[in-house]
């Protein structure tokens, strides 16, 4: 038995041509092919017998209006004779007879007729071939026709491989016009005067031809091609056939006449497009003749040959198209058919039956809307634009640039254009006419995604081919520019988030474009801004471009040397963009599983906090609170926050929850809310969110809604009267203003954790725990009061917040969320201009809830995007941002590793992720490199505009008593258009993958991401910055803002290190700053001693006097802490030179705040001063620096003589300050005294 088993398992058809096809299917295919061939031969014989007379008349000449009545009667007889033969096909799917058994089986058999009859003249990717009626001409032409028949297996191969790279090159244009002479012969053959064929096929071709224009009869009735009214229409159809049958017109006069007629038809007020009925009627005899000529002359150029098709060519085409239409159960929902050079799109059978039945029962309804496959927009639709598309259509007539919300978009899709060029679709007047009229009509099913994509493909084809339409020349969009503007998210799904666009990074960085090319990338957008703003175009017109630098390979070595060489030219702009040489190709290596805490930004609240959407949400929250329901955070679906305010509005417009459930419209509602279809259980989560948060609110009466709205508005007014504008409100923790904007701390934003309202209130993470503080501090009392007030404010307590703490996610999860939010905001890949336009619309109108995520990640924890291995290329390059902090030209190298300053950090964003208007708190310059992902839009205001900007923002935000710049730094986005109109210089640039952006000290900068992107940033500083940095440090201390590093430490570290090297320029810059610092430090020490603070100790040493007085106490651990970790309790100043500590409470004061505390408390009990350098060491260091700077001038005496008078009284007043050099006994005596 073992020997027989292999024989049983042998597959008999292993080497057969049809391997992989089940035997049952193969048998059916063979049977159907046989029947199809047989039926084809019979049909050919019948056509030869019935239509020979009409065929000869059509070939030999033109039929005019003056033909005899005898010909008219002869044509009528032909119609009647042939009616029985084509009755099955004339009753198209628009007729109710389609549901009968024979009609249902018929398409299946006739669909296979393609295999025996298909011709190599139709586009390669369309499943419906052009099948023009093959009327038998003389016998010599029959042999020519037979040579053009392809093999059945070739056609099957084409069907399986169409649109894919595997399609053989000889089949790429399978079905398109290749042999021009044969093509013309075929057209002559198909110019038939059989009016019966025209009549019978009128309904067939009208159903799928969605874009065909038509005229209305005076009574408003339009022929729908149904078999029921066929006999009633025969006189009119007969009359139409007689005039529509003239053959080719080959002279230029006829062409010019037809062009004029078509131009007139385009502007005819009664020209409309029907959704399913395309029959032509005429108001008068002359108009009918002209329109018939226009419809007949479809001119398109294929391989340089102008061809013209006759109307009768559509008869069999429509017939075959109806036969081969795929089953509704298949995945193919739309099929494309080329008839007379016009692309028409048809839906599956069931949908067509529904539409045609609807139109059949309502023939008197005005046909003023288009099909679902002809939606006019060629741009990415946003949620708002999709919902309000109908209102914005009426004023938009451009094909290549469609206005949406009053702004002009000029996006074209290169991918779709390229595909259509590859298919070889023929252009025609009718198609261009339909495209021109597209903006005047509405689609009944315009939100269907497939239809939108097909319509976009058709509209973009019309843009590229540049024909004359109505005397206007269509704009041709260069493919090169389209490639350059193409977004970078398309390939994201094919690779990991960390590496998904690295190939694009290399391509972008490798292109050594000229200056004019780079500028052309943005100047069109700027000019677009002028048009898209309408009345305010003067604001966008003044928006300047940031300089673009292209260093050579030799110049691109040391970033600080290169930046210093161009500083004079570019610093006045506040920022510049650097495009590296082509050989700069560092590979971005990120761990896809690295985790970080995100930041959630509410884009609609980045401008003014209060808007329509925020008001509705406040009403919902207030009602829920009255019901005892707490909504700490909005529900999430697919990682995206659900817009509850829009949700409740849409569900009411659809008739309420009950009707939505009964009619099963939850799916449609989810699509309208733009919830990602890939989100798990999106309908269940949507229903759960409604029941949990909106059901109670939705059941309120209109009077209760108005009452609730009045209460919310009253509460808002009271809040603003007490605290000022919402934008100026700050949380309690901002009194601790922990760290600068760009500093990540363990993956947290700004080193802080949010923790109030939806999420947690701000809490400083790098300040040591203050668990033992007493209420004797006024700040603690103020904090407690503010906490109580916030609880009383209720739902409006967090209105001033627009940024919240998110979750800890992996890079892969973040990427998926970014993809979902992109799909919520746009229906397809947007351009930079479209993202920018939609972003400012959301910020200014505030009518939609849009929440996006971003993250700032410390590279010291999760790794840099740059190569860091010693053997890796570019790991030691100067522009590698992990190498830059150690550059000898940067004075920040003396600080060591400081998170957010000398340690680079990653900026991970998605579409609309924003870095609001701000400047570094220390006014430090920095460099940003875009590793991978979508482009980023940067706006910059130079430092010279600071005072003017302060006044403008103060006026715009109505900041009563609050400096404008302080409000601007509270996450407020003001449009560059508004700032430009106020006279402030604003510059803009678009950073692409693989490019650097350099920001100069003091510049105000904001950034908007156009999609998922990863960039890396690090600070640097030269000696020219020290004066500005010292001034900024004093201002931050006054405003009680925490600094990431101590300016005192930096100056002393520079002085110690550079004094050994005798670096004259650097020492001369810091000498005056060191002198000022010395005077301030010694004066404050003397004042504290005079106030009664006599206990002191040096850092790192234990005061023996304290242990002698209290033997039970052990040395405090905080005595051994570095001063960089100790901040003043009051002003958040980093205490480097000295500080005052309260031993019992473990609280730190700077000398200035300690003096105020002693004066207020009238006691120094429990306080001790800690210092790093004693008085003599400070003076000695300053004198050494001044001596090296002065050199042989002898001016060092001035540096030494200043502190001398202060030194004498200090020593006489206290003998225990230099306690490290005194004995323990003397220290204890001085302490006891």
UniProtKB/Swiss-Prot annotation:
Residues 546-587 form the JmjN domain. Residues 873-1037 form the JmjC domain. One of its GO terms (molecular function) is DNA binding. Residues 610-702 form the ARID domain. It comes from Gallus gallus. One of its GO terms (cellular component) is chromatin. It is found in: Nucleus. InterPro entries: ARID_dom, ARID_dom_sf, JmjC_dom, JmjN, Znf_C5HC2. Residues 1-10 have a biased composition (Basic residues). A motif (Nuclear localization signal) lies at residues 102-108. One of its GO terms (biological process) is regulation of gene expression. It holds the Pfam family JmjC. Signal peptide: none annotated. It comes from the Eukaryota. The lineage of its organism: Eukaryota, Metazoa, Chordata, Craniata, Vertebrata. Residues 178-191 have a biased composition (Acidic residues). Residues 1-22, 65-148, 165-335, 355-379, 423-451, 466-542, 1197-1233 are annotated as: Disordered. This is Protein Jumonji. Belongs to the JARID2 family. Regulator of histone methyltransferase complexes that plays an essential role in embryonic development, including heart and liver development, neural tube fusion process and hematopoiesis. Acts as an accessory subunit for the core PRC2 (Polycomb repressive complex 2) complex, which mediates histone H3K27 (H3K27me3) trimethylation on chromatin. Binds DNA and mediates the recruitment of the PRC2 complex to target genes in embryonic stem cells, thereby playing a key role in stem cell differentiation and normal embryonic development.
């Amino acid at each position: 038995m073992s020997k027989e088993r292999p024989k049983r398992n042998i597959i008999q058809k292993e080497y057969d041509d049809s391997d992989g096809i089940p035997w049952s299917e193969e048998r059916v295919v063979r049977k159907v092919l046989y029947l199809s061939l047989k039926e084809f031969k019979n049909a050919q014989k019948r056509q030869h017998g019935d239509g020979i007379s009409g065929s000869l008349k059509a070939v030999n000449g033109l039929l005019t209006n003056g033909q005899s009545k005898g010909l008219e009667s002869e044509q009528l007889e032909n119609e009647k004779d042939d009616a029985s033969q084509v009755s099955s096909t004339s009753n198209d799917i628009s007729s109710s007879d389609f549901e009968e058994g024979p009609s249902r089986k018929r398409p299946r058999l006739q669909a296979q007729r393609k295999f025996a009859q298909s011709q190599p003249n139709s586009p390669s990717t369309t499943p419906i071939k052009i099948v023009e009626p093959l009327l038998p001409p003389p016998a010599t032409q029959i042999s020519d026709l037979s040579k053009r028949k392809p093999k059945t297996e070739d056609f099957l191969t084409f069907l399986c491989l169409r649109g894919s790279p595997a399609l053989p090159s000889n089949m790429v244009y399978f079905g398109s016009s290749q042999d021009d002479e044969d093509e013309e012969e075929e057209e002559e053959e198909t110019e038939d005067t059989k009016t019966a064929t025209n009549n019978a096929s009128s309904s067939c071709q009208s159903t799928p031809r969605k874009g065909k224009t038509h005229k209305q009869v005076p009574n408003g009735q339009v022929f729908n091609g149904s078999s029921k009214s066929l006999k009633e229409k025969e006189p009119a159809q007969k009359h139409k056939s007689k005039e529509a049958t003239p053959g080719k017109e080959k002279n230029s006069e006829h062409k010019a006449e037809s062009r004029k007629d078509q131009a007139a038809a385009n502007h005819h007020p009664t020209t409309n497009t029907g959704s399913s009925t395309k029959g032509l009627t005429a108001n008068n005899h002359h108009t009918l003749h002209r329109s018939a000529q226009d419809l007949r002359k479809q001119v398109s150029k294929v391989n340089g040959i102008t061809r013209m098709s006759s109307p009768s060519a559509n008869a069999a085409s429509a017939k075959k198209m109806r036969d081969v239409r795929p089953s509704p159960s298949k995945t193919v929902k739309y099929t494309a058919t080329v008839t007379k050079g016009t692309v028409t799109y048809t839906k599956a059978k069931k949908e067509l039956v529904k539409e045609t039945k609807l139109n059949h029962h309502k023939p008197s309804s005005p046909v003023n809307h288009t099909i679902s496959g002809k939606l006019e927009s060629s741009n990415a639709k946003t949620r708002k634009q999709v919902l309000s598309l109908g209102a914005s259509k009426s004023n938009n007539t451009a094909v290549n640039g469609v206005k949406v919300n009053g702004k002009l978009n000029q996006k074209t899709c290169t991918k779709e254009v390229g595909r259509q060029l590859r298919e070889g679709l023929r252009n025609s007047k009718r198609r261009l006419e339909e495209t021109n009229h597209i903006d005047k009509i509405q689609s009944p099913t315009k939100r269907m995604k497939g239809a939108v994509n097909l319509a976009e493909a058709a509209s973009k084809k019309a843009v590229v081919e540049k024909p004359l339409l109505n005397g206007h020349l269509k704009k041709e969009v260069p493919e090169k520019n389209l490639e350059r503007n193409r977004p970078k998210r398309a390939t994201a799904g094919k690779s990991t988030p960390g590496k998904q666009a690295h190939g694009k990074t290399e391509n972008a960085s490798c292109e050594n474009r000229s200056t004019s090319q780079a500028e052309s990338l943005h100047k069109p957008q700027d000019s677009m801004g002028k048009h898209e703003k309408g009345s305010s175009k003067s604001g966008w017109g003044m928006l300047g471009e940031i300089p673009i630098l292209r260093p050579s390979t030799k110049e691109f070595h040391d970033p600080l040397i290169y930046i210093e060489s161009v500083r004079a030219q570019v610093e006045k702009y506040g920022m510049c963009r650097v495009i590296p040489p082509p050989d700069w190709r560092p590979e971005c290596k990120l761990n896809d599983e690295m985790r970080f805490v995100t930041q959630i930004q509410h884009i609609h609240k980045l401008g003014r906090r209060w808007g329509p959407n925020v008001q509705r949400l406040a009403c919902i929250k207030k009602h829920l609170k009255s019901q005892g329901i707490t909504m700490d955070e909005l529900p999430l679906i697919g990682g995206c926050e659900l817009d509850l305010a829009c949700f409740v509005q849409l569900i009411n417009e659809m008739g309420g929850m009950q009707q939505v459930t009964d009619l099963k419209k939850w799916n449609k509602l989810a699509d309208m809310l733009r919830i990602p279809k890939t989100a798990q259980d999106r309908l269940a989560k949507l229903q759960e969110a409604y029941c949990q948060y909106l059901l109670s609110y939705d059941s309120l009466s209109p009077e209760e809604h108005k009452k609730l709205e009045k209460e919310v508005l009253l509460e808002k007014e009271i809040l603003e009267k007490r605290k000022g504008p919402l934008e100026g409100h700050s949380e309690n923790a901002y009194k601790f203003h922990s760290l600068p904007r760009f500093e990540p701390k363990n993956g947290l934003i700004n080193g802080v954790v949010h923790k109030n309202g939806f999420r947690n209130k701000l809490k400083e993470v790098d300040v040591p725990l203050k668990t033992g503080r007493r209420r004797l501090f006024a700040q603690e009392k103020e904090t407690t009061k503010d906490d109580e007030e916030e609880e009383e404010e209720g739902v409006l307590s967090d209105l001033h917040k627009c940024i919240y703490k998110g979750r800890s996610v992996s890079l892969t999860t973040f990427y998926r969320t970014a993809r979902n939010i992109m799909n919520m905001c746009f229906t397809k890949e947007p351009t930079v201009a479209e993202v920018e336009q939609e972003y400012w619309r959301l910020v200014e109108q505030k009518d939609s809830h849009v929440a996006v995520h971003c993250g700032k990640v410390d590279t010291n924890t999760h790794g840099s995007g740059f190569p860091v291995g010693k053997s890796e290329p570019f790991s030691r390059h100067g522009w590698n941002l992990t190498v830059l902090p150690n550059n000898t030209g940067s004075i920040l190298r003396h600080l060591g590793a400081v998170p957010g300053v000398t340690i680079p950090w990653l900026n991970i964003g998605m579409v609309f992720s924003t870095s609001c208007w701000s400047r570094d708190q220390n006014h430090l310059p920095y460099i940003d490199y875009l590793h991978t992902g979508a482009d980023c839009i940067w706006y910059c205001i130079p430092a010279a505009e600071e005072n003017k900007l302060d006044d403008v923002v103060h006026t715009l935000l109505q900041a009563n008593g609050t400096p404008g710049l302080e409000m601007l730094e509270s996450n407020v986005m003001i449009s560059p258009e508004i700032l430009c109109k106020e006279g402030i210089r604003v510059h803009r640039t678009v950073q692409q993958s693989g490019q650097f952006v350099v920001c100069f000290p003091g510049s105000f900068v904001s950034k908007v991401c156009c999609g998922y992107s990863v960039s890396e940033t690090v600070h640097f500083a030269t000696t020219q910055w020290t004066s500005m940095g010292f001034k900024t440090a004093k201002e931050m201390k006054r405003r009680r803002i925490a600094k990431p590093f101590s300016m005192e430490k930096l100056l002393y570290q520079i002085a110690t290190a550079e004094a050994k090297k005798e670096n004259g320029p650097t020492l001369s810059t810091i000498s005056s700053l060191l002198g000022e610092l010395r005077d301030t430090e010694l004066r404050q020490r003397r004042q504290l001693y005079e106030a009664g603070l006599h206990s002191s100790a040096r850092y790192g040493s234990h005061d023996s006097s304290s242990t002698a007085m209290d033997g039970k106490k052990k040395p405090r651990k905080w005595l051994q802490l570095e001063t960089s970790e100790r901040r003043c309790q009051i002003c958040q100043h980093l205490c480097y030179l000295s500080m005052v500590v309260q031993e019992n409470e473990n609280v730190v004061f700077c000398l200035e705040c300690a003096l105020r505390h002693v004066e207020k408390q009238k006691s120094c009990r429990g306080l001790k001063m800690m210092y790093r350098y004693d008085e003599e060491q400070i003076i000695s260091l300053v004198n050494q620096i001044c001596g090296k700077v002065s050199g042989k001038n002898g001016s060092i005496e001035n540096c030494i003589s200043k502190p001398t008078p202060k030194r004498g009284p200090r020593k006489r007043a206290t003998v225990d300050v230099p306690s490290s050099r005194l004995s323990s006994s003397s220290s204890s005596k001085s302490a006891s005294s």
